[in-house]
Structure formats: C-alpha cells, structure tokens
Regions:
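Juxtamembrane extracytosolic/periplasmic "stalk" immediately C-terminal to the first targeting helix
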Residues: 18-20
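Carbohydrate-interacting/catalytic domains
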Residues: 8, 13-14, 23-48, 52-192
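Active-site region of glycoside hydrolase catalytic domains
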Residues: 1-2
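Conserved strand-to-loop "acid loop" that flanks and positions the catalytic carboxylate
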Residues: 5
C-alpha cells in the first residue's frame, strides 16, 4: 500500500490540506493532525507533500519556496513539532511499519461507530507486539468512551495528536488505564 498525499491534491485551485479541513483555524490544525495521525498508523508506505508539515494555508507553488516564516507563529511551530515527533514515534514502533503489506499486521477492533466518528484498530510486528490506535475524527471530547481490548491489564496513551505541545486541547488519558472484564465489547473479553 502507498498512502499518498500527492502534489496534485494541493495545487490547481484544489486548496492546501489545511484549507480542505472544516471549522475554525484551530479545528483545521486538529483535523490535519488527526488525518495524518491516521495515515501514519494505517498500513502502507507514507507520502506527505511538502508544506503540510508547516500548516500552510496557501496552495503549493513550484515557483516559490515553502512559507518557512510560518514557523514564527506558535500554532504553525506546534504543527511542525507534531510532524517531527510522529515521524520519530513511527520509526521507534515497529508494529506501525514492519508488516504493512498484508492483513497480518492489522486487525479492526471497531470500524462502524459512524455516529461518534471513531475507529479503533490494532497494528502488529513480527513478534506480535502491538499498538492499539484510536482515531476520533471530530472535535468533540469523548469522555467515558469505551473500547474493547485484547488483554487484561494496564494500558497507557503513548501518543496523541491532541497533546498541548502540538497545539491541541491537552486532554490526556495518561497511563495505568486498567481494563475491566465487567464491560466486554467489540468481541473482546474486557474493555478500557
């Protein structure tokens, strides 16, 4: 799989990725982070077109350089920080890239919660280490949102597109999230 965000999507009057997002400027930044967080977690090789990492609102133009001056503004600097950190996170976590060419590296937990716009899936490496990915595609805080998990024990949030250092709301789920067998869901014996 190749997941391209090609130049053809951000030129010739089609708008930048930022301008394709709905909502306020803050919601546009959050939408791009959520979309690209999903892309990084999804199986397949990644291709990101230049300028997106800066949060450019203008279309890409081959006759001029990127709008590097945007990095002097806090929201754009935070967006740039997000891209740096998610790339490092991706490289450091082999379940995200080791088996990205077939179904052995991917499994759905929840793919049908269209009312909440949330999807949940698992990614695996060859040793069956795994990461659970939760994507919330709307700017609504999901308190007490439960997901089925494969193992009994403690879970922790290891990356979030909504962390304040990326310009997000700063809502964190933290660590030591204990699974509960009283609430089985999504075909799993426990949930968090």
């Amino acid at each position: 799989f190749v997941l391209p965000i090609s130049h053809d999507e951000v030129v010739h009057g089609k708008c930048s990725l930022m301008n394709k997002m709905p909502g306020t400027a803050e919601q546009k930044f959050a939408g791009v982070r959520a979309f690209l967080g999903y892309m990084m977690a999804h199986p397949g090789k990644k291709l990101l077109f230049m300028g997106t990492e800066l949060g450019q609102f203008i279309e890409w133009n081959y006759e001029q350089e990127l709008d590097w001056l945007l990095l002097q503004y806090p929201q754009h600097a935070a967006q740039h920080r997000f891209f740096k950190e998610i790339n490092h996170f991706y490289l450091e976590n082999s379940p995200l890239w080791e088996i990205d060419f077939n179904w052995d590296g991917f499994s759905w937990i929840s793919s049908d919660d269209c009312e909440q716009s949330v999807i949940v899936f698992r990614r695996f490496n060859k040793e069956k280490d795994e990461i659970i990915i939760v994507c919330n595609f709307v700017p609504v805080e999901r308190e007490q949102y439960r997901i089925g998990v494969p193992y009994d024990g403690a879970y922790e949030e290891v990356f979030s597109t909504d962390w304040s250092r990326f310009g997000g709301s700063g809502i964190e789920n933290g660590s030591n999230i204990i699974s509960e067998k009283e609430f089985p869901m999504h075909g799993m014996e426990q949930s968090i």
